[in-house]
């Protein structure tokens, strides 16, 4: 709790002339115990002493006598802060307490939650104004009441204001009625409600009710937001005080009910308000915005952060300022037009086109003042003007006039939120489910000091806060030039994006925070984290507690690639499970700065694995960054290795112009390959660069040279037919274009880069993909041929069914063993090279028996396949399956002793398109045919002699008689079907003899 000293006296003297703010909205919102009692003072003093002894002096245990000076120092600081706190109004106190709460750890937050609950219970039980507090709470969330209040504000014209200020009581009865602080609005009670004579009273009531808005009440929130455009216009017409609108902005920007899209839309109107305040402070309220501002403002546009630089993102925004000026010259017409300007005119970009934002504010603009307004100033992540003033003041620069009195309390709330105008503001670096916004809150310290001073000025003016608005007191300027030491403690830039309901409601439990893996033992501490709808948001903060009890810690220190930002191309092309994949996500580090060319410093440091030193560059300009030396880095506490690496990388930044010039010349002359040029672009795209339009010599314009090289590379890829179109090179080039689109230097050329990226993506899609998994030659049954394999003589199917390795002859009848005459039956056949198989118990028409099916080989399509699955074949006749017994078949083999001995392993030859595996055709086409049944095959003789037929019949009869003798007990009923089947088959074959064709 020991704070830095050295400028305490400056702050004390700066605010010595300030008094308590007396223009608060209503006294019922003030706590009843605002003045500490004696008991409270004693308890605070005891707690202060205890805290000082515990944490005030790190070396307190070494020397007990040193605790007294530390105790006195802390007590003085607490007294100073308390005195300042009492001088602030309710809105300032709320913003300060909100900022302090976000710096506490979880146990401290729970303690404060219990204390707040207890205090609320006691105050509601003992306070005399508890009824009014409850009524205000109800009205703040009642859409009907708020709508009536808004309608009354819109219908109250400036002419009505003048009439109301001079009207009698009878005239007031005819005025429209709207809500009060003490009762709920109903149509029957309109006459009993308090009558507001001015719009200021309505804004005071809104200011009282806005903090009581409950998250989730979308209807009430929409009414509050609808009031903002009308109130800003009235402020510019000097109808209502500026300080009231600023305080309303402050509540809205930190309210948990306001989403990120609503806050982004509020930023548009906030910038218009900043423009008006800056112009009023410079004495330009009644002048056209197209006129040249004073020389002080022109000088401050680039060095001290003038209002025109803060609010002019594009020429259309500048033109809108002209419209604002013209409306301020015609108050009546401007107020009448504000009736139709509701919240839909500032809808988020996702709901409405950007060129239609702000309604009639952009209707009269046709040009821009390029001499006084830098269109690039507002493109650097949309930082408010007050943050620019703070960064320049921290560098010791002076501010002209009262240009620091820009935002009031709004600067404190807006800088805490890190408001951005672009659509990519919510994009943050995500790693392991944790969003990280890497920037330091100290950049907004001066902004909060300005807001405190502005609000104190409002308090001193009392009932007339508009007067002396353009001329601040001299002591206040000195106070702004010397920010207090506790400014960084009270009003840190916490930078969260408060998006959803109950973000930091103390009535609900703090959401569980996600932790992330760390590869380093040295980590930075962070501020307390707020829960989000998607993930936790972590904000780097050097001023927070150094306790190890923080639930999440930022910034590991992983391994370093090299001394430059050269990356492996494979890491840019391929995907995997490495946690470095999302490090190249654009805008993952929200480094908010107004220094031109430095917004991308966080991305560059992250690529170097040196992002923990991002705080060194928060207030540096681009030129100062290039002048950093290794000795300077070591003098500010950077380690030796990191300082050496960073110094080498900064030296390489100075060589970028020469490298790009060399690459351009070699590409034009054809001496460099495209892949080498793309590699050089990869090393430069993440480095900080000034915008192309920045003043300076052309040889130092890195962005312009970078775009020239990209143009040469892309034209070569698209037009040169001899260029090597590599898929990998195209992918890396598209990655470079994606990074360039989000780079500050090419922000005005983003559309051209997107078109170029689209063309390259189409080219990449049209490229022939690489053939993967190519089978080498000579491998596999097809010898590496990826086409359909064809049948040939070398790969003819073998009869593996019956265990034979001999190939089946598919072109002729291969049954040589069965081609014999019955004349030679009594004698062995000497020319047989193949012999019949042993008898099988079961067999079918295809000769495969009951064995497993064979997968058909690739065969010529001109022949049908008979080798399919057995399920697809017709069932065999029952005579061939059920009436052959093993004993009978053995006797038949013994009787036909003219057959040679058959080995067990020799299978019969089969033809895939004939029936020769079942029968052997005997005799010519004119001879009758008959079947001779054998165990496993039938034979048709091929002899023209009638003796063969007679001999065959005698042989059949002898065979049947022998079977009867051997069977013995077999009945004639069992044998009769076999004779009948044989006779039927012979008769049928004899009749259809002429239809058989021998092959």
UniProtKB/Swiss-Prot annotation:
Cell location: Cytoplasm
Example of a GO MF term: translation repressor activity
Stretches assigned to the SAM domain: 600-654
Result of changing residue 658 to D: No effect on RNA-binding
Compositionally biased spans, kind Low complexity: 44-69, 329-338
Known outcome of mutating residue 640 to S: Reduced RNA-binding
Gene Ontology biological process: establishment of RNA localization; negative regulation of germ cell proliferation; negative regulation of oskar mRNA translation; negative regulation of translation; nuclear-transcribed mRNA poly(A) tail shortening; piRNA-mediated gene silencing by mRNA destabilization; pole plasm assembly; positive regulation of nuclear-transcribed mRNA poly(A) tail shortening
Known outcome of mutating residue 749 to R: No effect on RNA-binding
Gene3D superfamilies: Smaug, PHAT domain (1.25.40.170), Transcription Factor, Ets-1 (1.10.150.50)
Compositionally biased region (Polar residues): 1-36, 801-822, 854-864
Domain of life: Eukaryota
Impact reported for residue 613 to F: Reduced RNA-binding
Keywords tagged on the record: Cytoplasm, Developmental protein, Phosphoprotein, Repressor, RNA-binding, Translation regulation
Keyword Chloroplast: no
GO cellular component: cytoplasm; P granule; P-body
Principal subcellular localisation of the protein: cytoplasm
Oligomer status and interactors: Interacts with oskar (osk). Binds to the 3'-UTR of nanos (nos). Interacts with cup, which in turn recruits eIF4-E, leading to an indirect interaction between smg and eIF4-E that prevents mRNA translation. Forms a complex with aub, twin, AGO3, nanos mRNA and piRNAs that targets the nanos 3'-untranslated region, in early embryos.
PANTHER family attached to this UniProt entry: PROTEIN SMAUG, STERILE ALPHA MOTIF DOMAIN CONTAINING PROTEIN 4-RELATED
Protein name per UniProt: Protein Smaug
Organism encoding this protein: Drosophila melanogaster
Gene (UniProt): smg
């Amino acid at each position: 709790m020991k704070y830095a000293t050295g400028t305490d006296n400056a702050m004390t003297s700066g605010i010595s002339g300030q008094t308590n703010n007396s223009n608060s909205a209503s006294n019922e919102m003030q706590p009843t115990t605002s003045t500490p009692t004696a008991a409270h003072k004693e308890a605070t003093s005891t707690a202060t002493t205890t805290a000082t002894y515990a944490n005030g002096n790190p070396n307190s245990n070494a020397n007990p006598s040193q605790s007294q000076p530390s105790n006195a120092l802390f007590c003085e600081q607490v007294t100073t802060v308390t005195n300042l706190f009492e001088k602030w109004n309710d809105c300032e106190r709320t913003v300060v307490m909100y900022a302090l709460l976000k710096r506490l750890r979880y146990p401290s937050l729970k303690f404060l939650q219990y204390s707040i609950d207890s205090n609320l219970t006691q105050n509601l039980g003992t306070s005399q104004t508890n009824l009014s507090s409850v009524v205000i709470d109800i009205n703040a969330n009642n859409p009907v009441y708020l709508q009536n209040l808004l309608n009354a504000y819109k219908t109250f014209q400036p002419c009505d204001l003048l009439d109301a200020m001079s009207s009698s009581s009878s005239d007031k009865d005819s005025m429209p009625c709207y809500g009060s602080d003490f009762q709920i609005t109903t149509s029957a009670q309109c006459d009993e409600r308090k009558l507001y004579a001015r719009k200021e009273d309505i804004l005071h009531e809104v200011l009282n009710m806005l903090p009581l808005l409950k998250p989730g009440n979308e209807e009430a929130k929409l009414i509050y937001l609808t009031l903002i455009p009308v109130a800003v216009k009235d402020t510019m017409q000097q109808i209502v005080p500026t300080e009231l609108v600023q305080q309303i902005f402050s509540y809205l920007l930190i309210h948990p009910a306001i989403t990120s899209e609503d806050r982004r839309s509020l930023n548009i109107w906030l910038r218009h308000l900043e423009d008006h305040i800056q112009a009023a402070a410079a004495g330009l309220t009644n002048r056209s915005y197209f006129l040249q501002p004073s020389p002080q403002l022109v000088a401050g546009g680039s060095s001290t952060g003038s209002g025109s630089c803060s609010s002019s993102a594009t020429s259309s925004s500048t033109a809108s300022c002209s419209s604002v000026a013209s409306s301020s010259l015609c108050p009546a017409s401007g107020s009448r037009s504000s009736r139709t300007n509701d919240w839909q005119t500032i809808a988020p970009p996702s709901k409405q086109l950007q060129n239609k934002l702000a309604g009639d504010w952009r209707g009269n603009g046709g040009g821009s003042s390029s001499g006084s307004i830098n269109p690039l100033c507002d493109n650097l992540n949309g930082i408010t003007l007050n943050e620019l003033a703070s960064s320049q003041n921290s560098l010791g620069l002076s501010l002209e006039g009262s240009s620091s009195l820009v935002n009031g309390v709004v600067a404190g709330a807006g800088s805490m939120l890190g408001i951005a105008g672009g659509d990519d503001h919510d994009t943050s670096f995500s790693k392991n489910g944790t969003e990280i916004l890497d920037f330091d809150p100290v950049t907004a310290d001066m902004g909060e000091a300005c807001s405190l001073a502005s609000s104190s000025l409002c308090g001193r003016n009392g009932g007339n806060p508009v007067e002396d608005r353009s001329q601040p007191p001299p002591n206040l300027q000195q106070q702004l030039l010397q920010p207090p030491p506790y400014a960084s403690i009270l009003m840190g830039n916490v930078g969260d994006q408060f998006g959803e309901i109950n973000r930091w409601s103390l009535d609900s439990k703090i959401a569980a925070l996600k932790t992330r893996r760390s590869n380093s033992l040295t980590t930075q501490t962070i501020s307390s984290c707020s829960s989000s709808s998607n993930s936790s948001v972590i904000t780097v903060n050097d001023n927070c507690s150094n306790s190890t009890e923080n639930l999440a810690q930022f910034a590991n220190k992983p391994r370093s690639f090299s001394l430059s930002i050269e990356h492996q191309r494979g890491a840019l092309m391929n995907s995997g499970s490495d946690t470095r994949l999302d490090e190249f996500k654009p805008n993952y580090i929200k480094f908010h700065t107004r220094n031109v060319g430095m917004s991308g410093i966080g991305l560059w440091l992250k690529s170097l694995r040196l992002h923990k030193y991002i705080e060194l560059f928060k207030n540096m300009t681009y030129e100062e960054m290039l002048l950093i030396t290794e000795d300077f880095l070591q003098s500010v506490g950077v380690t030796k290795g990191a300082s050496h690496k960073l110094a080498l990388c900064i030296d390489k930044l100075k060589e970028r112009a020469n490298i790009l010039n060399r690459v351009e010349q070699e590409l034009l002359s054809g001496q460099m390959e495209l892949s080498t040029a793309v590699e050089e672009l990869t090393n430069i795209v993440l480095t900080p660069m000034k915008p192309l339009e920045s003043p300076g010599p052309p040889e130092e314009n890195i962005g312009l040279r970078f775009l020239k090289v990209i143009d040469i590379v892309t034209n070569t890829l698209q037009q040169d037919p001899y260029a090597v179109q590599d898929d990998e090179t195209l992918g890396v080039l598209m990655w470079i274009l994606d990074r360039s689109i989000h780079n500050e230097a090419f922000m005005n050329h983003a559309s051209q880069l997107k078109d170029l990226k689209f063309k390259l993506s189409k080219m990449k899609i049209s490229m022939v993909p690489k053939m993967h998994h190519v089978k080498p030659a000579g491998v596999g049954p097809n010898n590496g041929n990826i086409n359909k394999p064809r049948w040939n003589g070398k790969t003819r199917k073998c009869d593996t069914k019956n265990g034979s390795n001999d190939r089946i002859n598919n072109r002729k009848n291969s049954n040589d063993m069965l081609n014999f005459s019955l004349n030679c039956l009594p004698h062995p056949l000497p020319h047989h090279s193949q012999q019949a198989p042993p008898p099988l118990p079961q067999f079918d028409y295809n000769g495969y028996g009951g064995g497993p099916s064979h997968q058909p080989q690739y065969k010529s399509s001109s022949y049908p396949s008979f080798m399919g699955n057995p399920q697809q074949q017709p069932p065999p006749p029952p005579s061939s399956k059920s009436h052959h017994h093993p004993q009978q078949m053995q006797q038949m083999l013994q009787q036909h002793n003219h057959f040679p001995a058959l080995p067990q392993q020799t299978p019969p030859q089969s033809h895939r398109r004939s029936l020769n595996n079942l029968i052997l055709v005997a005799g010519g086409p004119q001879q009758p045919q008959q079947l001779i049944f054998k165990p496993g095959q039938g034979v048709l003789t091929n002899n023209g002699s009638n003796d063969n037929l007679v001999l065959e019949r005698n042989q059949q009869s002898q065979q049947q008689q022998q079977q009867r003798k051997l069977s013995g007990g077999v009945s004639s009923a069992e044998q009769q079907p076999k004779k009948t089947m044989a006779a039927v088959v012979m008769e049928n074959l004899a009749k259809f003899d002429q239809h058989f064709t021998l092959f």
